[in-house]
Amino acid sequence: MHYTIIDMEKDPRCGQFAYFRAMQYPFASVTVEVDITDMMTARGSRPFFLSLLYAVVRAANAVPQLRRRLLPDGRVAEYDWCAPSYTVMKPDGVYVYATVEGNLAYEEFVAEGQRRQKEVLERGTLTEDGNLRSFFFVSSVPWLHYTHAQNPMENPNDSNPRINWGKYVTANGRTTLPVTLTVHHALADGLHISRFYQKLEEELAELTRQWNESKKDF
């Protein structure tokens, strides 16, 4: 994946970058209840997980700071596009990882996601090839409506954002689910986390609009 090197000494966040880089646990994590009522009404038979994943990936890519990664030499790379590496459950209850590369339209994304999931389930091993540094690491816990999630991080230089979501519930006519975003605080702040959730709302609204205008179910 193509990336641009960011000169953090000239970046507006140069002070914050240096400050959080020195920490043993430089990560920030937020969980927000996201309203998916309109999406669920318009979804029809379209796959829920891949539909939400599509919106999440587009929202995360819309925030440049979430596409930034720490390189082994200490420099910061900003990728043009970051793909998801996400969990897929096998029949035995053990998960493997799948990826969907490229900035694809919705139907292409779903088709590629279904193809990749079939491949990784047949292969059965945990990991797959790809540029791990560029990925968003995504997982879901569809059995649990939680209030917060904490992700394992390999070391203080682990800069791949983690995105998780839990079980959706309906109350008072609205359907919501918890969505968690974990970032490296040297690369992103609360402003950028907030922008992700704003973009996610916009992407879900746009996807819902497209579905409502479409004359075909999936």
Which residues does each PLM region occupy?
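Short amphipathic alpha-helices and their capping loops
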Residues: 1-23, 79-89, 151
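Gly/Ser/Thr-rich phosphate-binding loops and adjoining beta-strand/alpha-helix segments
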Residues: 3-6, 21-51, 66-82, 136-138, ...
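Acyl-group handling in specialized metabolite and lipid biosynthesis
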Residues: 28-44, 93-107, 188
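Acyl activation and transfer enzymes in specialized metabolism, enriched
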Residues: 39-64, 177-196
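Small-residue-rich loop/turn and linker elements
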Residues: 66-99, 125-134, 218
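Helical lid/core segments from catalytic subdomains that handle acyl or acyl-like groups
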Residues: 90-146
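Histidine-centered acyl-transfer/condensation active-site motif
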Residues: 130-143, 161-200
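Flexible helix-coil linker/hinge segments at domain or subdomain boundaries
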Residues: 203-216
